[in-house]
C-alpha cells in the first residue's frame, strides 16, 4: 500500500508540473519536469523494487536485498533522450575513473577475507550502475536544466516532508508514520522525531541536511532567493523536528563552510576579514540558537549518555575488525555479518557499563557501525580507505579553484551543494551510518559527482552570469562599439 501511495503522489506531482507550465511547455521544460519527478522520487525510502533477498536481516548499510532504484528507470529515459535528440553523440567517458571503479570492485570481491561476497555484490552493483546513470545524466542535460529540475523536485520534497513532520510529531498524528513506509519506526517516547517519507528520523534528518545545503547554495548565488530562503527555513525546521542532533550539527557546519569558502572566498581562511565578518557573527548566532530554542535536543543527559555508550561500543567493534584485517578489510557491505559471526557481547562487559542499555547485543550485531568512516576502513582496509580520504581532502581543498574557474552560477550551486554534502559526511558520518544508505546516497552522490563535471563548469549562461562576468562582457561590448565608431566610412 505504501508503494501505491508513492506512485500516486509522483503522478500528482507530474500532473502539477505539466499543468503549471501550460502553454509554455517546450522540450527543454519537459526535460526539467522529468528531472524534477526523478528528484522527488528519491525522497521515498520505499521507492525501490527488491529483486533478490539473501534472507538475512544482518546486511550492512546496503542491506541484504538486490533492488531496482528510481535511477534505473530514469536511465532508460536518458537512453531514449540520447538516441532521439543527441543521435548517440555523447562525450567519451573518463577512462581513468572507469578503471578506478573496476579496480575497487575487483579488489573488494577478490578479497580473501570476504566471506560474504553476495552482500558485496549488492553494493558494487548499486555503485557501478549509479556511475553509469550519472554518465548518461550528464550527457543528456545542460547544467541549467539540471538545476531547474532539481530545484522543482526538492521544493516538492521539502513541502511534503514539512507537512508530514507537522502531522507527526507536532500534532501527534501517528497514522502518518507508516504512510509512505510500512516499516518505518520512530524513536522512544523520550525523544520522538519526524519520519515523513523516510523510514527513520535519522535518515530523514540526513536527507534534509542535503537539501538544506542545496537551497542555501541557491540563496547565496541569488537563484530564486526569496523562495530559496523559505525552503532553507522549512528544511531547517524539518531537521529540528527529526530531533537528529548529528544532522543538526552537520547542517550548521555545512552552513559555516559555505560562508567561509564561498561568501568570503576572496579572503584567506583565517584572515581578519573572514574571522570578523563571517566566523564570529555566525558562531555567536549558532551558540544562541543551540543554548536557546534548540537546547531541548541536548538537555536529556541520560539519553546523551546512553547514545555515547552505544557509539563507543560500536567504535570498539570497528577497532576489533580493523585489528583483524587492517590492510584490505572484510569486503564492502560485509562488516555486520563479520561482526555477528566473530563478535560477542562478552567483550563489552569488561570495558563498558551496560546496565542502562536495552538489549545491547541485539543492537550491536543487528545495526551497522554508527560511523561511516569506521565502516569504510573496516570494509576496505587502509588500501581502499586512504584514497577515499585523500579524495575528500582534495575536494575541499580545490573548492575555491573550481568556483573561480566556473563561468556561471548554475554550476556554482552544484559546487556549493557538493561542499555542503562532504561537510555533512565529515560531521554526521562520525556518529551515524545513515549517510551510507542507498536512499540517501541517491541525492548526495548526485551533487558531488555533478560538481566535478568540467563540462558543466565550462557552460556559459548570460542570463544568470556572475557580476564579474557581466562586467567583463559589458566592457568587451563597449570596446567593440568604440572600435566600430573609429572605422572610416
Q: What are the functions of these language-model segments?
A:
Residues 163-172, 242, 259-306, 319-323, ...:
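A membrane-periplasm/extracellular boundary helix in multi-pass inner-membrane enzymes
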Residues 301-316, 331-380:
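Long extracytoplasmic/lumenal interhelical loops at the membrane interface
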Residues 12-16, 388-394, 415-473, 489:
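Transmembrane alpha-helices of multi-pass inner-membrane enzymes
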Residues 11-25, 72-86, 210-220, 383-406:
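Hydrophobic, aromatic-rich transmembrane alpha-helices
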Residues 65-72, 93-104, 115-139, 151-153, ...:
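Aromatic-anchored transmembrane helix interface
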Residues 1-82, 109, 427:
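N-terminal signal-anchor transmembrane segment
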Residues 220, 224-227, 260-262, 272, ...:
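Hydrophobic transmembrane alpha-helices and their immediate junctions
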Residues 104-108, 148-179, 189, 196-264, ...:
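Alpha-helical transmembrane segments of multi-pass inner-membrane proteins
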Amino acid at each position: 500500500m505504501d508503494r501505491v501511495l508513492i506512485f500516486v503522489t509522483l503522478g500528482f506531482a507530474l500532473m502539477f508540473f505539466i499543468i503549471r507550465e501550460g502553454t509554455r511547455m517546450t522540450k527543454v521544460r519537459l526535460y526539467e519536469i522529468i528531472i524534477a519527478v526523478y528528484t522527488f522520487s528519491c525522497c521515498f525510502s520505499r521507492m525501490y523494487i527488491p529483486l533478490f533477498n539473501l534472507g538475512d536481516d544482518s546486511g550492512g548499510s546496503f542491506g541484504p536485498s538486490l533492488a531496482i532504484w528510481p535511477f534505473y528507470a530514469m536511465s532508460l529515459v536518458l537512453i531514449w533522450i540520447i538516441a532521439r535528440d543527441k543521435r548517440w553523440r555523447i562525450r567519451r567517458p573518463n577512462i581513468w575513473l572507469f578503471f578506478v571503479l573496476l579496480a575497487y570492485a575487483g579488489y573488494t570481491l577478490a578479497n580473501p577475507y570476504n566471506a560474504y561476497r553476495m552482500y558485496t555484490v549488492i553494493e558494487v552493483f548499486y555503485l557501478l550502475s549509479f556511475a553509469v546513470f550519472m554518465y548518461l545524466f550528464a550527457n543528456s542535460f545542460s547544467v541549467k536544466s539540471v538545476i531547474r529540475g532539481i530545484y522543482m523536485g526538492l521544493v516538492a520534497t521539502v513541502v511534503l516532508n514539512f507537512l508530514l513532520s507537522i502531522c507527526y510529531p507536532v500534532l501527534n498524528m501517528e497514522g502518518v508514520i507508516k504512510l509512505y513506509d510500512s516499516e518505518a519506526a520512530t524513536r522512544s517516547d523520550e525523544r520522538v522525531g519526524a519520519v515523513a517519507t523516510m523510514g527513520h528520523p535519522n535518515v530523514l534528518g540526513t536527507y534534509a541536511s542535503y537539501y538544506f545545503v542545496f537551497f542555501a547554495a541557491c540563496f547565496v548565488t541569488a537563484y530564486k532567493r526569496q523562495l530559496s530562503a523559505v525552503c532553507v527555513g522549512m528544511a531547517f525546521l524539518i531537521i529540528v523536528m527529526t530531533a537528529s542532533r548529528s544532522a543538526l550539527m552537520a547542517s550548521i557546519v555545512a552552513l559555516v563552510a559555505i560562508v567561509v569558502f564561498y561568501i568570503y572566498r576572496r579572503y584567506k581562511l583565517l584572515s581578519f576579514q573572514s574571522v570578523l565578518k563571517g566566523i564570529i557573527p555566525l558562531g555567536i548566532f549558532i551558540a544562541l540558537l543551540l543554548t536557546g530554542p534548540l537546547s531541548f535536543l541536548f538537555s536529556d543527559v541520560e539519553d546523551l549518555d546512553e547514545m555515547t555508550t552505544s557509539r563507543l561500543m560500536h567504535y570498539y567493534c570497528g577497532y576489533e575488525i580493523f585489528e583483524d584485517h587492517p590492510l584490505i578489510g572484510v569486503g564492502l557491505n560485509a562488516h555486520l555479518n563479520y561482526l555477528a559471526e566473530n563478535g560477542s557481547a562478552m567483550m563489552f562487559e569488561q570495558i563498558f557499563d551496560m546496565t542502562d542499555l536495552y538489549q545491547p547485543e541485539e543492537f550491536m550485531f543487528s545495526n551497522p557501525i554508527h560511523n561511516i568512516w569506521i565502516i569504510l576502513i573496516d570494509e576496505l582496509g587502509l588500501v581502499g580507505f586512504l584514497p577515499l580520504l585523500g579524495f575528500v581532502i582534495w575536494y575541499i581543498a580545490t573548492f575555491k579553484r573550481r568556483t573561480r574557474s566556473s563561468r556561471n552560477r548554475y554550476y556554482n550551486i552544484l559546487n556549493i551543494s557538493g561542499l555542503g554534502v562532504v561537510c555533512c559526511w565529515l560531521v554526521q558520518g562520525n556518529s551515524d551510518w545513515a549517510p551510507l544508505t542507498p536512499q540517501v546516497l541517491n541525492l548526495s552522490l548526485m551533487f558531488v559527482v555533478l560538481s566535478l563535471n568540467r563540462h558543466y563548469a565550462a557552460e556559459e549562461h548570460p542570463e544568470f552570469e556572475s557580476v564579474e562576468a557581466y562586467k567583463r562582457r559589458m566592457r568587451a561590448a563597449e570596446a567593440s562599439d568604440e572600435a566600430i565608431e573609429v572605422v572610416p566610412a
